[in-house]
Amino acid sequence: CQSLKDFGVEVTIVPCDRDGVLDIDAFKNSFKENTKLVVMSHASNVCGTVLDAEEVGKICKEKGVFFALDAAQSAGVINIDFEKFNLSALCLTGHKGLLGPQGTGALLLRHELAEALDPVISGGTGSASHLLTMPEFMPDKFEAGTLNLPGIIGLNASLEYIRRVGIDTIFETEKQLAQLFIEEIDKLPNVKIIGVRDWNKRVGTVSLDFESID
């Protein structure tokens, strides 16, 4: 957030509770006249809690602001519905739940937002090497320099695997392993699980709070 402030962007941070659950009332009250964009993590990389993207997307639509969802921890593990969540942008990395190589990722943009954005990185001018500036058409205007083709091919293979196995199957396996881990951790003294216990509202990321350690 600090880097955005350095560029003159006004940032409002909406709190979550100890388990990582978003305070919806605080979120609704956080909008200002100049609010343009809401950015939210779909699943916490600390406690595994999944935030209610559908509800947040509905509120953003009512307020008339763009909604960007960071799905780094959820893509490939739980289903994401671009339209149902009213997303303007979906950001994800390839090397986590999507099982792809490091250095890969994706940014899915709704047309209205893509048209409103200017390239933030330039170099090589992408597919239009004869130009002195980045192309103005999609997706080339956001693809500076040489693409990571080996990584993209590897990510494509991972996506094919996920499609073949099924996200629901992957989530069920992750759920079983995490549940077993949590059950055994619960037997230990002075150790608490951080995050919600409802498996409809979390992924397999599990963090621990050791009461004997400050």
Label for each model-derived stretch:
Residues C1-D214:
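Pyridoxal 5′-phosphate
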